[in-house]
Curated annotation (Swiss-Prot):
Assigned EC number: 3.2.2.9
Main EC class the enzyme belongs to: hydrolase
InterPro entries: MTA_SAH_Nsdase (IPR010049), Nucleoside_phosphorylase_d (IPR000845), Nucleoside_phosphorylase_sf (IPR035994)
One GO location term (cellular component): cytosol
Ion transport as UniProt keyword: no
Stated name of the protein: 5'-methylthioadenosine/S-adenosylhomocysteine nucleosidase
Organism: Maridesulfovibrio salexigens (strain ATCC 14822 / DSM 2638 / NCIMB 8403 / VKM B-1763) (Desulfovibrio salexigens)
Amino acid sequence: MKIGIIAAMEEELVLLVNKLDEPKTENFGQFTYHTGRINGVEVALFLCGIGKVNAAVGATLLLDKFKPDYLINTGVAGAFPGNINIGDIVVSSEVRHYDADATAFDYEMGQIPQMPAAYQADKLLLGLAKKAWINEDSISVHQGPVLSGDSFIHTPQQISQIEQKFPDVMAVEMEGAAIAQTGFLFNVPFILIRSISDKVHEDGSSAIYEQSMEKAAANSVRMVLSMLKEL
């Protein structure tokens, strides 16, 4: 079994790179790609950059070059519900674009025309995540809908618009839906594992993000490593 793991930022990937046995590194244009084994599992680690276009291009390269059986997106996210705290993990039940609007043509809000409205996380990967969070009892884990778009959500207007359109949202980030859509197009199952770096309703969320990002990224990596141990 081959697992592709993709992240937007070096801080979200470096701890996994450091765990690689028999590591190899390649560059494709401005993208960096590492292969090797973690706990005996063949993996490829891909640094895609921030935002949905970078994520889609990176995921496409990862799928084409490595041909993984499963795709995991690791990284950080902002939390919507007040009971989700900095450093907690959110496992995607589904992921949607929040910044796509083709409702004039009877598509759902967030739905790209001719694509699903929501991309469902793979059941096998969800099962691995559930086993992993039992083992990682020092981290609180939540499962629910995740939204993606090309903005850092922090203003009252942004927050209100998202909550009106997607009242069940648990976390928001900038790459997951593009990665999920790419996986859908290539028939490769996926899951998002995101740790909370900021809470969108708190003042100064960008400063909180800067302070918390490395800790949150490390927690997300811990969860992914626990999942790999379950394979």
